[in-house]
Amino acid sequence: MMSITDHDTVSAYRHLPSEIGLHLVPGVEFSSAWRDIDVHVVGLNVDPYSADMALVCDEQAERRLRRAEKIAKKLFAKKLIGSIDGALEGVRKIAKGSTIGRPHFARYLVEIGSCSDTGAAFKSYLSAGKIGDVKDEWPHMCEVVGWIKAAGGIPVLAHPAKYKVS
């Protein structure tokens, strides 16, 4: 038994062959906000063909695209990339149809020679407090939990050791 939980998309389930020899539990991972903290919530056993799930995945992808545009503008202002449109095209190619995130920008910065490796890209430009660390307004965690439940899923906190709460 296994689950594919990509950020903000269930598209992997549409591209799988009907017989892969594994029992897959359909899943998704959403970014959300709770008490000024970015919290990731996994939805297990969601209906990947639900119209509501498709809608919220599209909304999250739009949020990520707006965030990517902001990141590209900041990197361009520091002359780390040649053009905003070129960077967005480059990260889209790297993302291969999945939602765009900072790891795609890290790979792009390596690809164009602005950084030696993705670790350096994060350390210098994309990690917390750096120019490419663009905060987004994620939906509240309760809203995300509602989306998951509406699609028949079970919400699970992702990366529980990451959050410093008591």
Residue ranges of predicted features:
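An N-terminally biased module of ancient metal coordination in phosphate/nucleic-acid-related enzymes
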Residues: 1-37, 124-131, 139-166
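Acidic/histidine-rich helix-loop elements
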Residues: 54-55, 133-134, 165
